[in-house]
Amino acid sequence: MLMLIEGSRLLNYPILSLHTATEIARVKALVVDPNYLKIVAFEVAAINSHKRLFLDVNSIREFSKVGIIIDSDEEFVEQGDIIKLNEIIALGFVLDHMKVVSKKKSLLGHVQDFTVVTDDFQIMQLIVKRPIYKALIDPELVIGRS
């Protein structure tokens, strides 16, 4: 099912196993590819593991209001397991509070949140909190993907 969801709502989102029909983890952080502005993985806090684990978005069976549904906890990978994913994690790219500037180099504000389409986890819109002097006219700016 295609849904638009705010990026902030993805944090602490439950991950459910199709095999056990129970919650096996929660989303801890988002791994965003800055080249495509797309979520490529989720860092997860697994219930039965203290390792730093990730869930590749290609392993997701279904995204629903109940949670992210995957086959089992065998879908979780460690940081060094997938080379491409490891390179993106090493970048440490985080959208929250990132400065947004125009082509003319004027400050538009800072990223407050963003919306994601759940079929391929593309970031579709940035929700920008405006600086105080611009917030009087327009407190929030929504920038769509073009």
What are these regions (language model features)?
Residues 1-146:
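Peripheral interaction segments used for macromolecular assembly
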